[in-house]
A protein has these predicted regions:
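Interfacial/linker helices and their anchor residues that mediate assembly or domain coupling
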Residues: 70-112
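A detector for short, charged/polar N-terminal pre-domain segments
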Residues: 1-3
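Short C-terminal boundary/hinge segments that cap the last helix of small helical domains
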Residues: 49-77
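Short basic helix-loop element that most often maps to the first helix and adjoining turn
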Residues: 6-27
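Helix-turn-helix DNA-binding elements, focusing on the entry/boundary residues of the two helices
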Residues: 8, 19-20, 35, 50-53
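Positions in alpha-helical segments
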Residues: 6, 10, 36-39, 75-76
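Recognition helix of helix-turn-helix/homeodomain-like DNA-binding domains
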Residues: 26-48, 69-71
Length: 112
């Protein structure tokens, strides 16, 4: 398992945000914390609750939460692909979606 606080700090710094700025950004999600709370998360003195963590992930563009905070996700179909392989797979998915041939069928409600 990866260090939660270090991971948050890394992504915050990658986004060029100060702890105080992250605290302000969280207000968009009705989450009100002080910069020292962000500091406590990053230093491991405390941890964000699930709602706070999900908002942090959204703000810091963390999309694969499992991989980012725990490690290699056994359910990730891309887990054994390098970056180029992932890119090609995503390109193919995009082509399938654009074709319209593989859309999920809409179920029309039947009123009896």
């Amino acid at each position: 398992m990866k260090d939660l606080g270090k991971t948050i700090a890394k992504h915050r710094k990658d986004h060029k945000l100060k702890q105080s700025q992250l605290a302000i950004e969280l207000e968009k999600y009705d989450i009100y914390v002080k910069p020292n709370t962000v500091s406590a998360w990053e230093s491991g003195l405390s941890q964000p609750n699930s709602r706070q963590l999900l908002a942090i992930c959204e703000l810091l563009d963390i999309h694969d939460i499992y991989t980012e905070f725990i490690g290699k996700n056994p359910d990730n179909p891309f887990r054994n692909l390098n970056e180029e392989g992932v890119r090609k797979a995503l390109d193919y998915i995009s082509l399938l979606e654009k074709s319209g041939d593989y859309k999920i069928a809409e179920v029309i409600p039947l009123h009896v």
